[in-house]
Regions:
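Bacterial signal peptide processing site
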Residues: 19-22
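Surface-exposed amphipathic alpha-helical segments
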Residues: 144-168, 191, 197, 301-335
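Sec-dependent signal peptide recognition
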Residues: 2-10
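Signature of long, low-cysteine stretches enriched in small and polar/charged residues
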Residues: 73-80, 87-135, 245-301, 313-316, ...
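Secretory pathway targeting signatures of secreted, lumenal, and periplasmic proteins
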Residues: 30-38, 53-58, 65, 69-73, ...
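Long, folded non-catalytic interaction modules
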Residues: 24-150
Length: 335
């Protein structure tokens, strides 16, 4: 086993550990948790306080999936993208505790039991683009109290890594530059289009472009108007529900789990809506996201809509990928 070279109590310090040049492995939306069977329930309760985002498809689907493995398998799993080890108490007959003590060393381990240093987090500990976390406390109550209101900050570290890795995956190779350049030349806007996406429909008279991808079925459309007042907060929800009937004709958005959020200074969008779409003519549906973005260069309002149909399968990762694609929209001044 590998003894940790650096230690970082998450409050307020985060250590950047230099180790191997090999890339981390595993899905970016999965948390690989090494814990004993008796502590699995506690691990889930703790992690759900941090990773509490859910999309409705319409069934609830957690954005981050929690997977468990035995602590004895650490050597095989140490390059996982998001690796978590949980230990309660100091009984080294417990696999999670034995592993934690080995990695931290006796002195640092005892600090997690007798002091307030219950959470250790490092970057790139055993692989590039890895987040590695050790959670150790004498009991469940102190473990839960150790978060101290820092849940959003902790989650942001995982979100930043997710976005970075997914952008590399989506946009590094085989982008459809010809289509991107054509959109910019014709309409003075474009987005980054990964390999596998095809243009389904383009209507210059209606200011509408529709892209699609199979396996699973995903649809992505962009519509725009020269009507800045469309972003009036009093009418924005109505515009969301009018959009699919106006553009697609055969689908509608449902009120079930509908959410409307206003963007802030850190958001690329002005408004974001999420919820469930359904077909009017056949038993088909799934989650949707819809974004409003104001083009200040040309005084245009853009509506960007992402849909997926993937019955019985996980959809959250695909929805997040389409949001990353949406966020790449850019404009140039119309001559």
């Amino acid at each position: 086993m590998d003894q940790l070279k650096y230690y970082a109590i998450i409050f307020p310090l985060l250590i950047y550990s230099c180790d191997t040049n090999r890339q981390s492995i595993g899905a970016d939306n999965e948390l690989m948790v090494l814990a004993s069977d008796k502590h699995k329930g506690i691990a889930v309760s703790f992690l759900q306080k941090i990773f509490n985002d859910t999309i409705f498809t319409p069934q609830p689907e957690p954005v981050y999936k929690i997977k468990f493995a035995k602590p004895e398998n650490f050597s095989k799993l140490k390059r996982q993208s998001n690796l978590v080890i949980l230990s309660l108490g100091n009984d080294i007959r417990n696999g999670g505790t034995k592993l934690t003590r080995h990695l931290l060393g006796k002195k640092k381990f005892l600090e997690t039991i007798f002091n307030d240093n219950h959470i250790t987090l490092s970057k790139n500990q055993f692989a590039k683009n890895q987040l590695f976390m050790i959670i150790s406390a004498p009991d469940e109550q102190l473990l839960m109290e150790s978060l101290g209101g820092q849940e959003n900050w902790m989650k942001s570290l995982f979100e930043e890594k997710y976005d970075r890795r997914q952008r590399t995956y989506l946009f590094r190779d085989a982008r459809q530059n010809d289509v991107e350049n054509s959109l910019m030349d014709r309409y003075s806007w474009n987005i980054k289009i990964p390999w596998g996406w095809e243009k389904i429909k383009e209507n210059p008279d209606s200011n509408f472009v529709w892209l699609g991808k199979e396996f699973p079925y995903q649809w992505f459309c962009v519509s725009w108007k020269e009507q800045p007042n469309i972003l009036d907060s009093s009418s924005i929800a109505d515009k969301v529900f009018e959009f699919p009937l106006e553009i697609f004709k055969t689908i509608q958005f449902d009120n079930y789990k509908f959410r409307l959020l206003s963007g802030d200074d850190s958001s690329w969008y002005d408004w974001k809506a999420t919820g469930i779409w359904e077909s009017i003519v056949e038993p088909k549906g799934g989650p949707f996201s819809l974004f409003f973005k104001f083009d200040e260069l040309n005084q245009r309002v853009f509506i960007i809509n992402a849909l997926i149909h993937y019955p019985g399968k996980d959809k959250s990762n695909y929805m997040r990928q389409m949001e990353l694609i949406s966020s790449t929209i850019k404009f140039k001044k119309i001559n």
